[in-house]
């Protein structure tokens, strides 16, 4: 995780599923849960659509066998405007996770008018970009080892790929290490 990112780690795929179900119960928006209001700005649905990631019956049943951990990372939380966020998956099985993500991206391309799915180069590596002309879908997919990132932001994808080589990951930062010493898991 790049040092400049916020980071909400779920610890296990089951915890991620629980949080998704809870936020859906409150209108798909974590802020509704916190403020206990029933307003529905469809932020969760828009972000899901923008990333081209959906939870389906197969992922509910087999997700924990394919994914060991999930984190929400990003640079901002401007949910109304379109945040620079991403879902970071740690794979138990790289092949099955990449197959699932790529299948969802192909389905999203077919479903969205004018959607374009293309390979792009980011920091000398291969990435996948799925986008529509109006940016209702804008999704970069990059892989580094057993980590798979689906993000709305090219910059976030670049930083994700660069961070390990630069030793500037969030986990290496003094602030993060201090916070973990004060509030261990």
Model-derived features: positions:
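Structural boundary/hinge residues at secondary-structure and domain interfaces
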Residues: 1-126
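An internal, short helix-loop-strand segment that often contains or flanks glycine-aspartate motifs
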Residues: 55-57, 107-185
């Amino acid at each position: 995780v790049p040092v400049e990112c916020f980071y909400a780690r779920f610890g296990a795929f089951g915890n991620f599923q629980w949080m998704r179900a809870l936020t859906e119960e409150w209108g798909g928006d974590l802020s509704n849960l916190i403020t206990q209001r029933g307003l529905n700005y469809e932020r969760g649905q828009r972000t899901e659509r923008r990333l081209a990631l959906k939870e389906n019956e197969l992922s509910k049943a087999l997700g924990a066998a394919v994914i060991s951990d999930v984190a929400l990372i990003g640079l901002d939380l401007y949910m109304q405007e379109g945040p620079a966020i991403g879902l970071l998956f740690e794979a138990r099985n790289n092949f099955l996770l990449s197959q699932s993500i790529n299948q969802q991206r192909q389905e999203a391309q077919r479903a969205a008018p004018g959607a374009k799915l293309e390979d792009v180069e980011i920091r000398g590596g291969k990435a996948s970009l799925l986008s529509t002309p109006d940016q209702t879908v804008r999704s970069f997919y990059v892989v580094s080892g057993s980590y798979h990132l689906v993000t709305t932001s090219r910059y976030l994808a670049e930083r994700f790929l660069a961070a390990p080589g630069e030793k500037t990951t969030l986990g290496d930062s003094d602030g993060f290490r201090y916070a973990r010493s004060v509030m261990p898991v």
